């Protein structure tokens, strides 16, 4: 074995009929971890149901169906390998929880693959005012997915087939749209493909010999691997806290930024409780250091389980320790709220692992979501499709950070009526120092 390949996450976005499932299914099918026997079973079933055309999408549909029925599917099925990377496909956006997942940081994508239906009528439907293509691209950009690959799909079904004129027209239109969202289209490869026939997916297609750019596989290899934020101060949002006999209190969570090591003195925001980390474990093995992306449990000295809760954030007490937010200002995009949102609105915020009601204390401005420029000062309300700057006050102590400093703790979903009604990124935080915070003896010795 040479050097381990880097892992990257890609999110596949696009209009509902653009061919996301077929294209993703094709990659997983050709490059991925699906057992050949499973595929043969799927193919046989598809043939029996006269769904031959649906071969690759069928693979994905079966996986989704099995997952939704609660049959745990080995997540390797959603992975495939390129020459340079192990790629994991993050939930395709048809999935209800996609937006919430994308925001609460269960999955930060390194790159978005935008699939476009190049057929007559298909493209127009996807990019129209209410098409999902726009919303997905905007969401990806707002949530910090800075790299994108565009696939002009269904090139085998354009008129005439594999039409360069159609491709050029789409590139021009999509580029101007992506530019408004905030992407630089010059940095985005536009790959003409057929997810079904396989043109330009992995091998270069003779049907598209007018195109000189990369195939989809080559474009994936050109993604810049994410700089993992291990040089930032520690932020580890707690998912759970356990009491383990003979060991004591063990908080569990994923390192988002920084490094966690045994012997470190940590401060838990928002309460300011400070103690020493005795040991750090991942998959029942002791670690000398835990890095961003690691899901770990760590043992803390002289701390009762009741003093820590899900949503608290562990940080290094000597390096910008986490504190509660008195208030914070966010840029919010209203996505599916049936009415109007005015001052005093109090929904629930899902930010990292915390789930807390906040008050929209003051809608400061309404902004143009394309340019980010202010359109109106102190508007009375925001409605569907609007973007604005809002001052928010948490109803209980909570830790949030600015998106620019700590991205996973600076983006959130606004939940109301059992759905995501808005998404946002935090621009600044007014932090408050904890009063009467407990510092354990172990931590005092280390001072």
Swiss-Prot record:
Residues 14-21 are annotated as: G1. The modification N6,N6,N6-trimethyllysine is found at residues 79, 187, 306, 396. InterPro entries: EFTu-like_2 (IPR004161), G_TR_CS (IPR031157), GTP-eEF1A_C (IPR054696), P-loop_NTPase (IPR027417), T_Tr_GTP-bd_dom (IPR000795), TRAFAC_GTPase_members (IPR050100), Transl_B-barrel_sf (IPR009000), Transl_elong_EF1A/Init_IF2_C (IPR009001). Residues 153-156 are annotated as: G4. One of its GO terms (cellular component) is cytoplasm. Was detected in all tissues examined but was most abundant in roots and salt-adapted cultured cells. CDD domains: EF1_alpha, EF1_alpha_II, EF1_alpha_III. The modification N6,N6-dimethyllysine is found at residue 55. One of its GO terms (molecular function) is GTP binding. It holds the Pfam family GTP_EFTU. The keyword GTP-binding applies. Keywords: Cytoplasm, Elongation factor, GTP-binding, Methylation, Nucleotide-binding, Phosphoprotein, Protein biosynthesis. It is found in: Cytoplasm. This is Elongation factor 1-alpha. It comes from Nicotiana tabacum (Common tobacco).
